[in-house]
Amino acid sequence: MIFRWLTFFSVLPAMAATVSGTVELTDAKVKGWDGLVVWLEPLQGRAALTPGRVVLDQKNKKFSPHVLAVPVGSTVDFPNHDPIFHNAFSNFAGQPFDTGLYAPGTSQKVVFRREGFVRVFCNIHANMSAVIVVVPTPYYAVTLANGGWQMANVPPGEYRLRLFHERATQETLGGLEMKVVVSDGMLTVPRVKVSESGYLEVPHKTKHGREYPAKPQENGPYIGGK
């Protein structure tokens, strides 16, 4: 009986952990430490992904939320809640896409099939922007205003902790990567300081590489668009 009891418990999976931490911005140009993405990549093999479906709203001439994190294979909906036409596009290497022009009360969707950082804009409104961070892992979080983040149900193992901040250079972010060893229970990762020093913000252009017009054509077809 004792042997069977021990054998039964030996095949039970190890309990998952809750991993948390804080990210602090230095040399920040904008108040608040929210909107940074933190994720864990297993050092051995790849974690099983469950693609999701999330929403990036267009309302009051803004994308909301401004920063979105999704696992590879996820679908993002871009509903237009404004009484004017909108568009969503990206020419960046993460995954270029273009929804075309679409009317108020309608929506477009994009499936993000590869990891990367996707900077999203509207081809009509130059002030509209967002970032979609597509990660190769189910273990990720977006920081709150105080820089805090938390991930639940992380299996025990060795991971590489990685970060994304839209106003930090790749060199800065690469230097902050660290090995994290997760066991069961709670794990608090040491505070990470991210500097915005060295990042140069350049005004973006339309999907055709042109300057935005001084006054957008919001209520109908526009030159050069779909």
Where are these regions (language model features)?
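Sec-dependent signal peptide recognition
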Residues: 1-8
